[in-house]
Structure formats: structure tokens, C-alpha cells
Amino acid sequence: EQQGLPAPKILISERAQVLMPYHVALDCYEEERLGKNSFGSTKSGIAPFYGDKFQKIGLQLCQLYYPDVLREKLAHALDIKNAMIVNLYHREPVDLEALIVKLTELAERIRPYVADTDAYMMQAVREGKKILLEGQLGTLRDPDHGIYPMVTSSSPLAGYGPVGAGVPVWSIKEVIAVTKAYSSCVGAGPFTTELFGDEAEELRKRGGDRGEYGATTGRPRRVGWFDCVATRYGCEMQGATEVAMTNLDVLGYLDEIPVCVAYELNGERVDHFPVTPKLEQCKPIYVKLPGWKCDTRGIKNFDELPENARHYIEFLEKEVGCPFKLISNGPRRDEIIYR
């Protein structure tokens, strides 16, 4: 506002759970305690946050505006949290009064944006407005259907989108799954097609917008070849109606491109995505496709892509079993090929 910019047109649900400073601290302390057995957390407080939510000791945003409720809820939570912080992690306890002051100040700053978003969204549904829900992470980080326990704490499946947004399930008509032209991951867990050494570093350096590095942590992402087994499973669990594939342009340096079409488990071919203990024993079965050895950036029509690039997309599409409708051919928003 001081710079003359308009206020953001956003609404924050009054029912939203509040991420506390001690959630972040506990996340960091636990990763440090686990050492080499850590889960590869982003140390953003996600697991402690959801733990409090489901133990019903978390705070909803609306409760920050009722001083007595805030104090009572926070005092109860800190009885538990400080016991952990002091006795398990051997750190200084959180000060109740200082935290109340901080939360009260923050609550006033965002007060203009706090609203009954459930009512707002339902009105949008009744008026037939277009609604776009966006999720992060993917199927393999889902706590039920992913590579448990190396997962996140809330479901990244499209089916949970309406739950989080407060709209009827039937109001969602299309589900667009997003995948890269290769595989990448931040965090621990089995990664069947993972690359190492110089081969991995070359792909990592060329990938993403400015290389494959975590948006939150900045740490190097693990990278590998496209995994049709995992992607097919992901699309099935998401109920995807179409796929948007990014980073096609990244692969233009390769003479040939391995694609994982199945796994080998104890000497047998596996075409479905297995549970984590079995996945850890799987080896990739590759088909090698010819590369196109040129820069495809600037191409806007699918038919103008090199023949081998088109064949690569069509091969993945057939293996995954879902139409690839959008192809990202560069980091800019306008570098998308629509099919």
C-alpha cells in the first residue's frame, strides 16, 4: 500500500488452521534428532501442524479474535509442546505471553481478508462461476496412497480439493495432472528411476526454471527418467481427465531417452505400483527412445515438434493411459503447446 499498489484480492477462511512458530521449531528439532533416519522434511512445520489439528489442540484463525479462547487454547497446547521441547529436545520453552502478543498483532494485520469462504464458494457454485483449485506435491506423497511413511501430512489427491475449498464434490468436472518429461523429487523415499553422479547433475542443471532445486529448501532435487508405472498410478489415484507435461525442452540434449515401462521385483515383471517395502526392492525396466537433439523452445504447435519429440509424448501418453493435452516447452507461461 505504501508503494501505491492495490490491496490483494484474497480471502482467508476463518476456519483455517494456524501454523505456529513452535510447529516449525518442532519440525526442525525432530529432523535433527532423527539424523540419517530423517524423512527429508522441508522443516516448514507441516507434520506438527497436522498433528495438532487432528489431536484437536490446534487453533483456527477465528479463535485468534477471542482473547479468552486464544489464551486458554494456547496455554493448553504449550503445556504439551513445552514438555516435548524441554525434555525431548532440550531447548528453551515457548513463552505464552510473548506468543499471544505476536499472534494478536498478526491477526489484526490480516483481519480485512478473513471471511466465511465456505459461503463465498457456495455462492460461486450457485452462480455457475469457474472454480480453479490448485494442489501441490503429488500422489506418491499422499499419506494413504503414497510411499508411506515418506509422505506429507495432508492429502494432495484431487478428491480432497473440494474438501479443502468447501465446495461440493460434484462441482469439479476436470482434473489436470501435472508431470515433468522426466522425474524429480525432494525428500526421502524410494525413487526407482533415480540417476546419480554426472548424469544426474547434467539433468538437474538443465531442468526446471533455473535448475532442479527445491522451491522451499533450495536443496538439489533428486532426478531420474520418466516412470510410466508411477505416473499411471498417480493419474489413476487423482482421477485425472488429462495431463499437462512440463519441461519437454529440457531433454533436447540427449541422444536417447530411457523410459521406465515396468518394474522388476524378485525376477518378475511388475506393471502396477507396489507398496513401499516392495517398491524399495524394485528395479526399473527401460525402453530407450531416440532423442531429437535440438532446442524445441519457440515451437507453439504440436505438429511442428521434431518427430522424435512427438513420438516421445505419444509413447508416454499411451503408457500412462491419459491424454497429454498441454505440453510446456519452456519456463515462460506462454511457452505451452495445446493439443
Which ranges hold each PLM region?
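Non-transmembrane, aqueous-exposed alpha-helical and coiled segments at domain scale
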Residues: E1-R339
